[in-house]
């Protein structure tokens, strides 16, 4: 597909606004929002001042940085399980590794965090049967949702380019299971002309719906999942969620451009003379024809002045720099810190990459902050990944005739483990609480082992039956061992 394409814009006002705003967020992610910043500066300070500032530079993008910072759920492979068929779960996990699904999932999380939605298609090559997880940004998607589950599509349209009559054209690929008895997949051009047979050589409607996208009972399903940045989305699309972060990114970029302008034009003291001229200067004409005195020199030069009129008092003086760069930089960095907090990141979650305690530039998550973010985001993405696991098992069954369960899969994400020091500190604190009677034994075991209280209770019951349960808690030194 050509790389220099322009995405079609939906004809409706709401659809057009959604796509245009989503594309702004994507330009921020890809570092191609220079023109957006130029327009913002002109609208904010006027064309004359904007021209005086010069071309703005993209020195920071908090929206992109925050989206990438919190996308830590797929730093390691997730565990796939099934209560009734562990072997099937292992096969799904193995297929994901072959597909390199984790890297696609992580990229999808970045898109989801920044644009609030992302499309993930489980594509099965009709010729080879190979599976691939396609990632599609929401500016290329439209669809209709299940009324009872507003975040789950029953019809999805993807804008993409196909070769038709030896040239690339924009088409809409429509997948629909609104009517389970009459599902269809169609390729339509801009005039709604059906190009399915020209592109694929056949139609996919009703009984011709691809068998690989049918469940064991014959019901069709969409090989798509739309991830959302919230656990219970109220609609299929929510493009303006966290608009404050996008606006703040524009504001701090404008502030950065102004600081750069002041650094270049107003960071030095202003020296003035009256009725004096540097000795040895040469008279020249300026661009407007007025006379000017020119003298070659630098900061190490010692200048001598001579009066122009012996009858008039000669004077020289100096004004301070016109811009207080330290104050400007302090306000700029504090605003960056507020943007991070508006994303839900507390100061305890962050580790600074500079020795200046006031600075909020180049923040990254601490180990505890990473675990906290993983725990907060897991309930949001788990339903989507469990749905993807079920789709994967279903497609595998159609391909190899297997009988794997086609629902009921469970996803557990691999949280960042505690460091040795963190584990020892946790054990000391937990045992101290247990010795004081502030927490029961199952809670203490759950905290130390990193499991649930129910699982810890089962372990304690098993230890009691085996007669290996200690009658008193170990000391902190014993726990460290």
Task: Tell me the role of every PLM-derived stretch.
Residues 1-155, 163, 475-481:
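Extended, helix-rich architectural segments
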Residues 102-116, 120-121, 259, 263-264, ...:
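C-terminal amphipathic alpha-helical
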Residues 112-114, 119-238:
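Extended, regular secondary-structure scaffolds
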Residues 204-365, 414, 418:
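Extended, charged amphipathic alpha-helical segments
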Residues 268-271, 278, 370-386, 392, ...:
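Long, compositionally biased
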Residues 436-446:
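Short, charged amphipathic recognition helices of the HTH superfamily
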């Amino acid at each position: 597909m050509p790389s220099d394409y322009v995405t079609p814009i939906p004809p409706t006002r709401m659809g057009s606004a959604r796509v245009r705003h989503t594309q702004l967020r994507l330009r921020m992610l890809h570092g191609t929002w220079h023109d957006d910043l130029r327009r913002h500066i002109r609208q904010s300070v006027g064309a004359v001042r904007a021209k005086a500032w010069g071309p703005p530079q993209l020195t920071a993008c908090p929206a992109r940085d925050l989206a990438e910072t919190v996308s830590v759920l797929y730093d390691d492979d997730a565990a796939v399980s099934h209560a009734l068929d562990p072997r099937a779960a292992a096969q799904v996990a193995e297929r994901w590794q072959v597909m390199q699904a984790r890297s696609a999932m992580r990229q999808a999380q970045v898109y989801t965090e920044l644009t609030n939605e992302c499309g993930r298609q489980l594509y099965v090559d009709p010729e080879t049967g190979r599976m691939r997880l396609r990632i599609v940004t929401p500016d290329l998607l439209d669809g209709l949702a299940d009324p009872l589950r507003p975040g789950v599509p029953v019809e999805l349209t993807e804008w993409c380019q196909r070769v038709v009559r030896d040239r690339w054209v924009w088409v809409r690929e429509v997948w629909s299971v609104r009517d389970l008895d009459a599902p269809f997949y169609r390729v339509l051009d801009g005039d709604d002309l059906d190009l399915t047979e020209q592109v694929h050589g056949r139609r996919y409607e009703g009984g011709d719906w691809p068998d690989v996208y049918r469940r064991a009972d014959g019901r069709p399903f969409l090989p798509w999942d739309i991830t959302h940045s919230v656990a219970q989305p109220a609609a299929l699309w929510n493009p303006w969620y966290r608009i404050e972060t996008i606006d703040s990114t524009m504001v701090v970029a404008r502030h950065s451009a102004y600081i750069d302008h002041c650094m270049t034009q107003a960071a030095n003291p202003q020296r003035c003379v009256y009725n004096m001229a540097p000795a040895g200067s040469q008279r020249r004409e300026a661009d407007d024809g007025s006379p000017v005195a020119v003298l070659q020199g630098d900061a190490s030069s010692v200048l001598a002045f001579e009066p122009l009129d012996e009858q008039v008092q000669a004077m020289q003086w100096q004004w301070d720099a016109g811009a207080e760069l330290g104050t400007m930089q302090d306000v700029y960095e504090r605003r960056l810190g507020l943007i991070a907090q508006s994303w839900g990141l507390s100061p305890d979650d962050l580790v600074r990459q500079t020795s200046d305690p006031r600075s909020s530039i180049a923040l990254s998550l601490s180990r505890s902050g990473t675990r906290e973010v993983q725990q907060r985001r897991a309930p949001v993405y788990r339903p989507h990944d469990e749905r993807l696991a079920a789709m994967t098992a279903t497609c595998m069954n159609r391909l190899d005739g297997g009988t794997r369960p086609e629902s009921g899969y469970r996803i557990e994400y691999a949280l960042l483990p505690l460091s040795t020091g963190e584990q020892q500190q946790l054990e000391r604190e937990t045992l101290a609480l247990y010795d004081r009677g502030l927490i029961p034994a199952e809670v203490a075991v759950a905290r130390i082992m990193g499991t649930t209280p129910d699982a810890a209770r089962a372990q304690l019951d098993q230890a009691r039956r085996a007669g290996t349960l200690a009658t008193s808690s170990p000391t902190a030194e014993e726990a460290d061992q």
